[in-house]
Amino acid sequence: MLIGAGLFAAGFTFAINWLALIPWRRAKDRHWTERARLYYPVLVAAKMNLWVLPAILTMSALLLWPDESPHWMLMVLATAIGTTAGTVPMDHEVFPRTPLNEILRLTVVGWLIRFATWFVFLSAIALSPDQFNSQSLIIFVAVLALLILWNRRGWVWAGQKFGLFLPPPERLQNIVRDIGAGMNVPVRELWLMHSVRAQAYAMPESRRLVFTDRLLQILSDDEIAAICAHEMAHLTEARKDYYQRYVLWLMFLPWLFFKPVVHLFGLFGYLVLVCSSAALPRLYRGISRKLESRADGMAKAAERDPGTYARALARLYEDNLMPAVTAKQTTHPHLYDRLVAAGVTPDFPRPAAAASTTWYGHILAGAMGALAVVLVIRLTEQWHLFN
């Protein structure tokens, strides 16, 4: 059953991604903003599918074959591998500039790093008792400590071991040194990250900056400096501001008490967990947009030539096929609005907003929710039967 489930996950993922990309293929000669608008919902759905489809297949096996199905964690593992493998052809089609073997390597590394986190989280839920007691509290504290350690240093350490993080080239070191001196912002660590996407990250708690090699390939020194100024602006955030970003952790941490919550409160307890997890991303996005707008303003103030930062932003969005406008607010303001705020009139009209996900993304999410409700009801019935 495990092999069959994994193969089904891979085939199903490949099929729905291929079908969803048809509008994007037809727009290959259109402006990049239109191609990005059509690609974005497919990307979001594909990312959701990495955990939604394994959840659906695992819960379906538990409900249909409760005695014959493999352990649920093995089902999650097999279907997660299959879903990830089924996503590779889409990545290669959209970004053909990257050799297939390189996409495969980065996919495997990314999957291992991501699954390590989920393995700890799911194991903690499995080991949790049915009641609130000292054991459930110890498990919660242990996972929280591991999460803090992983966030501060663990994922970089793992990335180094897998060859994902490399020492920064002299070109990048000089740019960061110059911008840091001009903004009076010290940087503790600087890393070059191997990625198919052009991105940069700042970690205020560890004063760490990360730039991808793709970003260095497509941007000039002045444009890299402008992006660097934006990331350094995050390093100047007040503690209360960047600690607010950790509100996102509250999406996941309460689920460590899934078993005692459902055991005591049944379906109502499960729905409370779902509603809290659904509400927090909106709060997080609002916090993030405020801090991103602040960083945009500081980057514009630090640019040497007017328009450099806006030009760099536009090139990043175009290269990554990210939409200029989205239907729902995300963690960053719309690119079109960011360009206008930077004092530049975009060389394209304001495009239509990209959809938040695909039609099948909504269907799969709904199916997962329905299966979870049925599974919770069955679990509560079993607990009441044996107690």
Where are these regions (language model features)?
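Juxtamembrane boundary at the C-terminal end of a transmembrane helix
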Residues: 372-387
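Short, glycine/alanine-rich hydrophobic alpha-helices that insert into or span membranes
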Residues: 367-370
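Functional transmembrane alpha-helices
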Residues: 251-256
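Transmembrane alpha-helical hairpins and terminal membrane-anchor modules
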Residues: 273-284
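Basic helix-turn-helix/winged-helix DNA-binding cores
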Residues: 8-10
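Membrane-interfacial helix-loop-helix connectors in multipass membrane proteins
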Residues: 258-272
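Polar-ligand-bearing catalytic/cofactor-coordination segments
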Residues: 2, 12-135, 142-250, 283-365, ...
